[in-house]
């Protein structure tokens, strides 16, 4: 009789414990089943808030933002927010003087998102990074020319033409030309 009683008590204890574990496991699984995209968007919103709360760029926070944008654009390349995050990445990379990366972000926009709302600006910024920071005059000329040909009515066309005319010129040459145009002043 003691054996049966012990067996029944043990069985009830095991059943009660297993029911509790299922509920605990279920709650744990529910907590783990968070949409990764939503989690990433929440993280991006948080880091953007942190960046905008300071008048100066913090390189560590900027690096964190670039990492989050990279994760998003890599995992969701067809999402409508992806070109925005690439553009923001280009701006941040330029601000923290990571010019090759900035160029790459703008180039990716131009190649993969031709209907993006800031496509003209992306071409111009891509060329500007090549021109002003990477000293790649011929590549810059090519991108400026693409901008002019693809978007002849763009507000960036005149700036692109002026930049092409100034490619390869030293600061002294540019100053002399400016003074000459303004009557030697």
Which residue stretches match the model-derived regions?
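Acidic, polar-rich low-complexity tracts and alpha-helical solenoid repeat scaffolds
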Residues: 2-8, 19-185
